[in-house]
């Protein structure tokens, strides 16, 4: 057998054996409290490395089980949560997270573990329309952490409606009364995942020097109708949506200039208090109740007002690296989606790993653990490795995957 053929045969056989081992590890036996031991972790690292290099196509499932946990203490330990601040810098700069979710519990649980730090605080808003099973699972998870809580008021969230913005604001209001001295609030959805460690996020936000991060511009042509016409939320058990009417809206209050931007932002505590109390913010919220996707104009419009705490100048544009998103209409720029599109946004597949790893953004959107498990697993492993490498304290054995 020629050497080149022999080499190809050996590589092929090895690949098949590794795949079988992975399959058995993934689906064999009771998966409650399944965790990566040393050999599993090494195996996953090798698989991820190969996949990023475009050499392998593996299926991997390392399910983080939340249900039927015997105790919070055991769950926190066996799920490898980090239970102590890793540096004084992070202690001195706690973060607040707003997490608005409605389904896909496993993906949310991975996000929560990835961003969890004991010095931070977490407000979780569960869609009022979510199933009882989902609500119960989230409540059970959150109850294990003294620095996490459910929003005091839950909204039945409608895609594109005011309820989505109101869900964020409900958490912002709850967080404003927290004794945790958080510096910035970051809003997320259940299909986000961090690309940077907590320390890296802290250092990035410290660099803003109190400025709020609300990427956005003056409305392009396709977005003008969102605030020009009256919109109505339609809410039912079968289908919820926003409809556009032919009625024109009055001008915005206080002669505000409306901007169009990202629904995902990083807000200083001072700005959060302004949003809750200042008449301009309160009136803009009321005016926005019958617009389309008000979360995409509310934050950026307020943050362009001169003199507002942490405001950015009108020409700030899309400044900031909050979210890595692959839009369907921008394939020429990002190279295409290797998963599939939903609402014009890529659900990341395994082939997107290299692009995600190269991104300078703090977070990426969107992920589905049950559809593309390896994508989340590889990012999670890489993030934990960097997190522990940056630690300035002794690392507990349970923090390793």
From Swiss-Prot:
Q: Which GO terms describe its molecular function?
A: acetylglucosaminyltransferase activity; N-acetyllactosaminide beta-1,6-N-acetylglucosaminyltransferase activity
Q: Which GO terms describe its cellular component?
A: Golgi membrane
Asked if Transferase is a keyword of the record, the answer is: yes
Q: Which UniProt keywords apply?
A: Glycoprotein, Glycosyltransferase, Golgi apparatus, Membrane, Signal-anchor, Transferase, Transmembrane, Transmembrane helix
Task: Provide a GO biological process annotation.
Answer: positive regulation of phosphatidylinositol 3-kinase/protein kinase B signal transduction
Question: What is the topology of this protein in the membrane according to its UniProt annotation?
Answer: Single-pass type II membrane protein
InterPro entries hit by this protein: Glyco_trans_14
Q: Looking at the keywords, is Glycoprotein present?
A: yes
UniProt topological domain (Cytoplasmic) ranges:
1-7
What EC number(s) are associated with this protein in UniProt? Answer: 2.4.1.150
| Localization annotation | Golgi apparatus membrane
This chain is glycosylated at 37, 255, 315, 389
The transmembrane segments are 8-28
Catalytic function, reaction form: a beta-D-Gal-(1->4)-beta-D-GlcNAc-(1->3)-beta-D-Gal-(1->4)-beta-D-GlcNAc derivative + UDP-N-acetyl-alpha-D-glucosamine = a beta-D-Gal-(1->4)-beta-D-GlcNAc-(1->3)-[beta-D-GlcNAc-(1->6)]-beta-D-Gal-(1->4)-N-acetyl-beta-D-glucosaminyl derivative + UDP + H(+)
Q: What enzyme class is recorded for this protein?
A: transferase
| Secretion signal, residue range per the UniProt entry | none
Principal localisation: Golgi
Q: Which biological pathway? A: Protein modification; protein glycosylation
For the Lumenal compartment, the record's topological domain ranges are 29-401
Protein purpose = Branching enzyme that converts linear into branched poly-N-acetyllactosaminoglycans. Introduces the blood group I antigen during embryonic development. It is closely associated with the development and maturation of erythroid cells.
Protein family (similarity comment): Belongs to the glycosyltransferase 14 family.
**Name assigned to this protein:** N-acetyllactosaminide beta-1,6-N-acetylglucosaminyl-transferase
What is the scientific name of the source organism? Mus musculus (Mouse)
């Amino acid at each position: 057998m020629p050497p080149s053929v022999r080499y190809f045969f050996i590589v092929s056989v090895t690949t098949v054996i590794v795949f079988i081992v992975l399959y058995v590890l993934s689906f064999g036996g009771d998966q409650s409290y399944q965790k990566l031991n040393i050999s599993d972790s090494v195996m996953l690292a090798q698989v991820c490395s190969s996949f990023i290099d475009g050499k392998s196509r593996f299926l991997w499932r390392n399910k983080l089980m939340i249900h039927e946990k015997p105790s919070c203490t055991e769950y926190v330990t066996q799920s490898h949560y980090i239970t102590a601040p890793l540096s004084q810098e992070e202690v001195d700069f706690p973060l607040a997270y707003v997490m608005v979710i409605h389904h896909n519990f496993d993906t949310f649980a991975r996000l929560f573990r990835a961003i969890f730090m004991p010095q931070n605080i977490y407000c979780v808003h569960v869609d009022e329309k979510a199933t009882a099973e989902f609500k119960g699972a989230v409540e059970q998870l959150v109850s294990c952490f003294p620095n996490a809580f459910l929003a005091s008021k839950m909204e039945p969230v409608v895609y594109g409606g005011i309820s989505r913005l109101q869900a964020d604001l409900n958490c912002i209001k709850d967080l404003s009364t927290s004794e945790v001295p958080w510096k910035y609030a970051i809003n997320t959805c259940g299909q986000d995942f961090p690309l940077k460690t907590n320390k890296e996020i802290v250092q990035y936000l410290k660099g803003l020097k109190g400025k709020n991060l609300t990427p956005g511009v003056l409305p392009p042509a396709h977005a003008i109708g969102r605030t020009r016409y009256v919109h109505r939320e339609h809410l039912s058990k079968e289908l919820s949506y926003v409809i556009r009417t032919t009625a024109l809206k009055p001008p915005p209050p206080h002669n505000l200039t409306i901007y169009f931007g990202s629904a995902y932002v990083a807000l200083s505590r001072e700005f959060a208090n302004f949003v809750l109390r200042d008449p301009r913010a309160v009136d803009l919220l009321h005016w926005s109740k019958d617009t389309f996707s008000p979360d995409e104009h509310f934050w950026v419009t307020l943050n362009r007002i001169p003199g507002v705490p942490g405001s950015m100048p009108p020409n700030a544009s899309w400044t900031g690296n909050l979210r890595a998103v692959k839009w369907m209409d921008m394939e020429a720029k990002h190279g295409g989606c290797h998963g599939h599109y939903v609402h014009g946004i890529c659900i990341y597949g395994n082939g997107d790993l290299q692009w995600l790893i190269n991104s300078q953004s703090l977070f990426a959107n969107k992920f589905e653990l049950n559809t593309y498990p390896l994508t989340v697993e590889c990012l999670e492993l890489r993030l934990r490795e960097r997190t522990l490498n940056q630690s300035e304290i002794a690392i507990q054995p349970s923090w390793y995957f």
